[in-house]
Amino acid sequence: MKLWKPTLISVLSALTLFNAHAEPKQLDSVAVIVNSGVILQSDVDSALKTIKANAKQNKQPLPQETVLREQVLEKLIIDTLQQQEADRIGVKIDDNRLNEAIKEIAKNNQQTQEQLIASVAQEGLTYPEFREQVRKEMAASDARNALVRRRINILPAEVDTLAELLAQETDATVQYKISHIQLRVDDGQDKSTAETLANKLVNDLRNGADFAQMAYAYSKGPKALQGGDWGWMRKEEMPTIFADQIKMQNKGSIIGPFRSGVGFHILKIDDVKGLETVAVTEVNARHILIKPTIILSDEGAQKQLNEFVQRIKNGEVTFAELAQQYSQDPGSAAQKGELGYQTPDLYVPEFKHQIETLPVGQISEPFKTVHGWHIVEVLDRREVDRTDSALKNKAYRILFNRKFNEEASAWLQELRASAFVEVLKDEKDEQ
């Protein structure tokens, strides 16, 4: 069963694969210690069972048991580390946002709420378990997005240069469906060994070998458990090392091997199409930000904002006056809380959800992001089509997406390298 829409795969990829409690366990044990947390043997067994069942249903080959287990353990470790980061920085997913995400899942699977619940039960989950797992994965994704955003610096000159190039292009933009194999070269490892293997894999692939099977067996990349499938992307959405290699190759082309800082890469172009949408919705909103401190608790910040909303509704004070006096976002406070016309994608998920769903002129309930507690009011929405502003927004998104993918990969590697991880010997491995 496919629960997730394509655009949610990157946000919730581990959910159906690695979270299932279909059967009560009489005995359980710790499989991996990850910092102060643990991964249970039942989690590993459930993940392996689900992957094998899905592979059997889809008639997909799998690598040897030891290789598959290693990949599953590594994915569970990475997921756990991201969830720990979400807890550390205090990311919370409220019920309203969770409900919207679940509605979106049902919609994209062409299911009613009842049909989704039935499908979840077939996967071995109760509906409350499913909800909490979605909440957990959304929190981990939000933490990753927020922490990686802080590492990204985009200069105005970069945006202007790319916007000028985009203005010279035609409206149609080619999209590629690509698959990827990454052979990692660790410190002290002989690079020639990895290069020899990479050349052999390319030769085998060009002679008809199955790419997904090769990815399962050899890839150390982020999509190894999906057979290396990265899905549909425009070149500007790809990591730079991919985009630099793809010119105008045809469907079925094998590209590589080519080097990066982490090892050797092989790409396959599974399909090509040339469609692009250019309409952009921009939102002008204003907000008030209150940051919790040692003295001011979350509850205190929320209460203060609720009082602000009530005072505005009573006509005692204006939103602009309160923003100037109290908002702890210096940039917008000087503008009476106004953020100007921006595309919603530029904001963190909770803020984006509010400005996308609020009616114009309505003030939100207080809500929390990684920056603190907010209230927001949407002042206006407008559609922008091929203006200078739209081109610059598009250029910014392109640069952001490229740098985000690169920085996210580096962040995960740093997170993994700095973590205390101990994989405990499984009794099954000793038999």
UniProtKB/Swiss-Prot annotation:
Residues 173-271, 280-380 form the PpiC domain. Residues 1-22 form the signal peptide. It holds the Pfam family SurA_N. Its EC number is 5.2.1.8. It is an enzyme of class 5 (isomerase). It catalyses: [protein]-peptidylproline (omega=180) = [protein]-peptidylproline (omega=0). GO terms for cellular component: outer membrane-bounded periplasmic space. Its main location: periplasm. One of its GO terms (biological process) is Gram-negative-bacterium-type cell outer membrane assembly. Keywords: Chaperone, Isomerase, Periplasm, Repeat, Rotamase, Signal. The keyword Protein biosynthesis does not apply. It is found in: Periplasm. The keyword Repressor does not apply. GO terms for molecular function: peptide binding; peptidyl-prolyl cis-trans isomerase activity; unfolded protein binding. The PPIase activity resides only in the second parvulin domain. The N-terminal region and the C-terminal tail are necessary and sufficient for the chaperone activity of SurA. The PPIase activity is dispensable for SurA to function as a chaperone. The N-terminal region and the C-terminal tail are also required for porin recognition. Chaperone involved in the correct folding and assembly of outer membrane proteins. Recognizes specific patterns of aromatic residues and the orientation of their side chains, which are found more frequently in integral outer membrane proteins. May act in both early periplasmic and late outer membrane-associated steps of protein maturation. This is Chaperone SurA. It comes from Vibrio cholerae serotype O1 (strain ATCC 39315 / El Tor Inaba N16961). The lineage of its organism: Bacteria, Pseudomonadati, Pseudomonadota, Gammaproteobacteria, Vibrionales. The gene is surA.
